[in-house]
Amino acid sequence: ATKGEQVAKSPVSRVLRVTADGKRYYVKRYLGNGKNAVRRWFGLRGLVAPQRVVKEWKNLLLFRKWGIPTATLVGYGLEHLERLATASDPCLRDRRWMAQVLRQVANITRTLHAAGFAHNDLKWRNLLVDGGGSPTVYLIDCPSGGMWWGVFLKYRIIKDLACLDKVAKYQLSRSQRLRFYLDYTGQRRLGVEDKQRIRKILAFFEGRE
């Protein structure tokens, strides 16, 4: 957890003054939405961010775009899926919510691979998701990604899908995982090549976990 001097307080948030590398920063830490005690963060990472937090940082960015003096945002974001999994967040048990998230992850992954790009570390921790009834997934943190071709691309695609499944196999049902794969391929049912690829995905991390 971020530590610093508390300079402001409300029923749902705290503002901390933090010094790092000789520079002073202010971090707004959300404690909840007023109805529960689930901790949420603004400026750093936390659990699923409430819509008011997202709106707040977007407004600050708009103010700066319009030339209105405001604090410079040096960090803002939502939470990665892996934290939700390790915290056993109830969102993961909401099948409708998860269906929306998985559909977006499938679309993101398909778009990357269709362009010949492999993420190379496509794990849940590199996917941010906001809250609300209509969640939005954001892809972050891709220092190892790059363009590939031929058999090299095919291998990297298997790796990307295996990275996603590394947590999914413990958090999702078999039907959810199958639905994700079908959304990724844009198909209604599995073909022979799909079954071969799935076997490679499942075997990718065998003996390495």
Please place each PLM-identified region on the residue numbering.
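Protein kinase-like catalytic core scaffold
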Residues: Y25, P69, T136-Y138, A162
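Hydrophobic residue at the +6 position relative to the catalytic HRD Asp in the kinase catalytic loop
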Residues: L122-V129
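Conserved hydrophobic "DFG−1" position in protein kinase catalytic cores
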Residues: R17, V129-G131
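Conserved ATP-binding subdomain of kinase catalytic cores across diverse folds
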Residues: A1-A85, Q104, R110-A115, H119
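Alpha-helical membrane-targeting segments
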Residues: G34-Q51, S88-P90, F152, L178, ...
